[in-house]
Amino acid sequence: MIEIIVPATTANIGPGFDCLGMALNLYNKVLFEEIEDGLQIHGCEERFNNKENLVYTSMIHTFKKVGYTPSTGFKITMDCHIPESRGLGSSAACILAGVIGATELSNSKLNKEEILKIATEIEGHPDNITPALFGGMTVSIQDQTSIHFSKVPIQNNFRIYGLIPNFTLSTKESRAVLPQEVSFQDAVFNVGRTALMLASFMNGDLELLNFSIDDKLHQNYRASLIPEYPSIIEKLNFLDIKGSFLSGAGPAIIVIAGKDNLGLADRIQNRMLELENKWTVKEFNMDTQGALIKRWR
């Protein structure tokens, strides 16, 4: 038996659209067992208990990539804690679990860079896959043939909070509201703030972070899909935070605060009670290891 543990991720991180991501200490755990024949999937909703399951399709895709034909069936047991369609990398976690599981089951000698490439082929973009695989904060971009990435050595002098609503938002829907073109002025706005924000994380300068985490490429457009979004941001700005941003395509929101801002989760939660929808506040730590493999006899 092989268990693959994959962390949640938050992508974009304000102005870093489609290139920045960070792994969080919330996990999906997937156990793979070889059985005589057939497919058994346990631990997830009934609608995912079939051959269209993302873990399974990612596993089969990887088998084909490495030229492996399984001679057994599989039992897949899922223990998923990353909420679906909230912008916290649930699909990236399932894809990586399937790719890594297939790599182990087939005894392939794929390195992490090769796993990254296969998983990104399935996901379509590397900004969630990269931190989920390597841990920490990462910058990743892809061209026609390669994925280029680097881990960012950031200071651990801040707290991370996730505001997770009781409604979902698909990446497809969230992508659809984005413009085909943006102004040169908005592009320059994001380039400068992305560079300054990375320097702020690396230097531990949370005051600069508060200024640089702003964005003009995607958040304003996606805000229209999230009920009461302007009101939420207004409430957060009264709580002495160092910045907030949409997590991936949304609807979850990530808040960055100083280490000395104690009891913030309760104060955010109290503000969220004033809203029409239910929002759950969760404190995170950054996961620094990325996806893990455990073998059980």
UniProtKB/Swiss-Prot annotation:
ATP binds at residues 83-93. It holds the Pfam family GHMP_kinases_C. HAMAP family: Homoser_kinase. It comes from Alkaliphilus oremlandii (strain OhILAs) (Clostridium oremlandii (strain OhILAs)). Its main location: cytoplasm. PROSITE patterns: GHMP_KINASES_ATP. It is an enzyme of class 2 (transferase). NCBIfam families: thrB. The keyword ATP-binding applies. Catalyzes the ATP-dependent phosphorylation of L-homoserine to L-homoserine phosphate. Belongs to the GHMP kinase family. Homoserine kinase subfamily. Pathway: Amino-acid biosynthesis; L-threonine biosynthesis; L-threonine from L-aspartate: step 4/5. Keywords: Amino-acid biosynthesis, ATP-binding, Cytoplasm, Kinase, Nucleotide-binding, Threonine biosynthesis, Transferase. GO terms for biological process: threonine biosynthetic process. This is Homoserine kinase. Its EC number is 2.7.1.39. GO terms for cellular component: cytoplasm. GO terms for molecular function: ATP binding; homoserine kinase activity. It catalyses: L-homoserine + ATP = O-phospho-L-homoserine + ADP + H(+).
